[in-house]
Amino acid sequence: MSSNDSAQTRNLQEERFNERTSTPTVVTAVLPDTNGPTTNSTSGSVGPPHPTPNVPVPTQSSSDPPSASGIFAKEIDLPRNVIQHSGNKFILDVVPDSRFPTFAITEFVQRSFSNFTFEQYSYVSPASLVGYLVYMIHAFVFLVDAFERSPMSAYASEIDASHAYLRIIDAFSDAYIPDFLFEILDTYLSHRLDIRSKLEMNVSYGSVLYKYDAPRIVAPSIFLLAHNQLISQSRESTAYEKWLDSIVIHYSRAVIRVGNLVGGLYQSSHGSTTTHFTYRNWFARSLSRLADSATHRTHLRRPMISEFDYNIPSVNNNTYNPYVHLLMLEPNNRNITLDFIRSLSSFCSTELKATRTLRDHISRRSAAISRCVIKGPEAPTWHSSPLDDLKEKSKQGNFSQFCEVAKFGLPRKENSESYTFKFPKDASTIDTAFYLIQENGRSSVLDPTTADEELHTEGMNLLFDPYDDESSAHYATVLSGKLIQNSNIDGETLLLPDPTTGLARTNSRYLQGSVLIRNVLPEFDQHEIRLFPRYPQISRLSASLTLLFNMRQVWIPRFKQKVDEQPKLSNFSWNEGCDGTVPSLNVVTAESSTNGPAAEQQVILWSSYRHVSNSDRPTVDTVYYYSTLELLFGTRSSMMQTYNLHQLLSLH
């Protein structure tokens, strides 16, 4: 045995000894007390108290194992001869796609606003009320991050460390919110798994990266800009377009407008001529009613209405903090943010009869956070292409034209043939069976699916539930925006238990089913998206892939010149005709490649469920997206099929 082998054996034996001599951890199926610490802060900030949870927690199955009363039970004495370990602490962050609750909130406001007496509230309009309710969703996420997640994320820590934010935090903690919003917030309550209680699921923006998430996390500021547009003296017919043209944020050198974030405005340039187009996707169609000509006409006649003095923030990758932007905590926006919260809270208390606040809600617990929607590829409701100032009335756009600008669902690009591999034609020089180049090889049969309005706006969805198969339990799931949108991942691997590995590691295999987002294509960074489809699942539902020796790597053999016998290459399929225009490899790993970094980000995935591997600001090398939760909860989980929210909830 080599010295390396003996060292490894000693380490394993020492690890087993340490586990055996430590106090055994008894794991039960009943959640431990979830009251949490009084504060999760080192700055002394107070924040919401932690009331006793009043949501039922998961309990053991009715089919509990029988008691140890067998013939040899006393001699075997398992309680004294079994080592237990509940695993290491692990935080799974949940980032809702807030377009979906925003869609529902907008419809709620549209259907009810005319019943309210709003003239005496100068900051209240349909747009500002929608913005307020969306703001409270982001405020709830922050409060859970700051006072329930332990440790709090780096983004939350930056805010918690400054007393300048305390007045605003207190204001939104005590602001009044209608009961309707709690139907959505209840699906964001924290949860610990029953058996694996060291795994905690918390709603948090601690993993958010601007180029991956910005258009899916709706900024309340866009509704303040819509409110301002309603009282402008511009022509009614251009009010909606002027709102789409409004600047929301400067990110690095990019000017991001409302039209970028909701996909309602794009442009096409030919020579020196630039033409703007408006296009109403399902999201923009809902929001357009907040700033259309009819709404503009109604509120322009109000005797008392005030403009929000919103200052456009400028950030870059190093300074962007989603909580600062979404909660409008910039120094030059704090006063107007306080006025906004207090005015809309008073309105909700008086007109909507709201009596509940976030302060008393964040410490509750529910397994509903693990329910989500699973989607296939969908057309974006945004684009990151530049928008010039709108100077003339726009033209009517369409789906195909918008997808070209958004670079979604593009056809296969032409092979430029700009690089030629060397190919030794002398058969005595090389064994061609082991050479990866084909002379005059055939073209690939792989072809991407191009953008299709019906397929990519009205495709069916799946509802995932790890605990139940009751369809009515998913009413709030479809509103919540908790989703996994997967375009090209066809399967994930599961690291199998190994008795020679420490028990703590074995019971902490929580990253199974996740993808390091260094491998994922950013959606808001002008990347071309080609939808090479997954293979049909007909006749292969029982298919499996088994990885030997090391599941963290994919081995491509590099043989010595002199070998024991001629090797047989099997258990793989040739991907014929690779030419740089089609995928050449169909595997990505979190491990650093021994052959250099990945040439491209080819995974097309967005997931609400993430993990950040350290306590610093997130980066593409520390954030993992979960492409499935089945490797955490098992395939016993329930799957149901349903339609999109914009098909289920009609606009009034």
UniProtKB/Swiss-Prot annotation:
Compositional bias segments (type: Low complexity): 34-47
GO CC annotation terms, alphabetical: viral capsid
Region (Disordered): 1-70
Start-end of Polar residues biased regions: 1-11
Location within or outside the cell: Virion
Domain of life of the native organism: Viruses
Keyword Nucleotide-binding assigned: no
Presence of the UniProt keyword Nucleotidyltransferase in the record: no
UniProt keywords, alphabetically: Capsid protein, Virion
Function summary: The capsid protein self-assembles to form an icosahedral capsid with a T=2 symmetry made of 120 subunits.
Protein's name according to its UniProt entry: Capsid protein
